């Protein structure tokens, strides 16, 4: 494990196990480790209990599959490939097929771009290959069903968005849809038609993935607010979204979760 400069961290034994380590310092004259105070049993218990409580809440209101989707999506949004490796394993062990995990990563490119989506897919490929080399053959699963609707893609996407958001398809356009009409067309045709019509994930699962991806991206509170509202319209409960943010906080940190928790609380108060 390599620790970046100026990162305060602890290491040592847990309450029920011992731990030994060798610290290697480069350039010890100018880069010497600064040893701080020991961590007391009370401090250790407080920190670990907080994490356990967050996951306990998630376990109460989110299935293991939903928790896996949240973790995969948020790490992908952030571009944290190192933590994605273990997260992919947990997703597969939670019963997700290879194609279903891939679908989360494919969905992600609409919200965090092709580079992070593709890097996550490449990382997932290596995880699957390593597991196969170790005699673990993960279930590939079915492909997405063929889309038989030959209707206008813009209108199909418009109708999907109206269904999941509860906002009339005939609502007047505003904001970016007027300023850059082509992006609004791409959103309807590609995101809400081409992607949302793929049936490897439900609408609910896609929206859980979406808000998690946005959490990982950071700094996109207005988009998070819109999609959190869609989640609520689809029947996802406030406590489920709160548990989602607990997972984000545990995995990515409070700087990723807290701005969104403020937005979520404001949204819930208006309901």
PLM features: what roles do these ranges have?
Residues 103, 107, 112-115:
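Substrate/cofactor-recognition hotspot
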Residues 9-11, 21, 87, 107, ...:
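Histidine-centered active-site/metal-ligand motif
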Residues 220-229, 242:
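Short conserved catalytic/interaction loops centered on acidic-Pro-aromatic/His motifs
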Residues 1-6:
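Short acidic-glycine-tyrosine-enriched beta hairpin
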Residues 51-66, 75-94, 100, 116-203, ...:
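Acidic, glycine/proline-rich low-complexity segments that act as flexible tails and inter-domain linkers
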Residues 67-78, 205-220:
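Amphipathic, charged-and-aliphatic alpha-helical interface segments
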Residues 10-51:
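Double-stranded beta-helix
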């Amino acid at each position: 494990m390599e620790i970046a400069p100026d990162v305060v961290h602890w290491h040592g034994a847990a309450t029920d196990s011992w731990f030994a380590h060798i610290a290697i310092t480069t350039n010890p004259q100018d880069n010497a480790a600064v040893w701080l105070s020991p961590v007391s049993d009370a401090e250790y218990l407080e920190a670990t209990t907080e994490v356990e409580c967050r996951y306990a809440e998630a376990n109460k209101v989110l299935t293991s599959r939903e928790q896996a989707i949240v973790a995969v999506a948020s790490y992908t949004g952030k571009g944290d490939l190192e933590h994605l490796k273990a997260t992919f394993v947990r997703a597969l062990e939670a019963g997700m097929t290879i194609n279903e995990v891939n679908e989360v990563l494919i969905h992600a490119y609409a919200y965090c771009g092709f580079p992070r989506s593709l890097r996550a897919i490449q990382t997932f490929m290596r995880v699957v290959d390593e597991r196969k080399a170790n005699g673990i053959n993960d279930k590939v699963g079915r492909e997405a069903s063929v889309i038989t609707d030959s209707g206008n893609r813009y209108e199909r996407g418009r109708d999907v968005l109206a269904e999941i958001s509860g906002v009339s398809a005939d609502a007047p356009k505003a904001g970016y849809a007027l300023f850059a009409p082509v992006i609004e067309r791409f959103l309807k045709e590609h995101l809400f038609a081409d992607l949302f019509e793929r049936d490897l994930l439900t609408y609910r699962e896609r929206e859980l993935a979406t808000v998690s991806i946005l959490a990982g991206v950071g700094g996109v509170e207005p988009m998070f607010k819109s999609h959190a509202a869609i989640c609520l319209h689809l029947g996802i409960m406030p406590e489920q979204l709160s548990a989602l943010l607990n997972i984000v906080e545990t995995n990515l940190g409070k700087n990723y979760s807290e701005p969104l928790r403020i937005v979520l609380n404001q949204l819930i108060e208006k309901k």
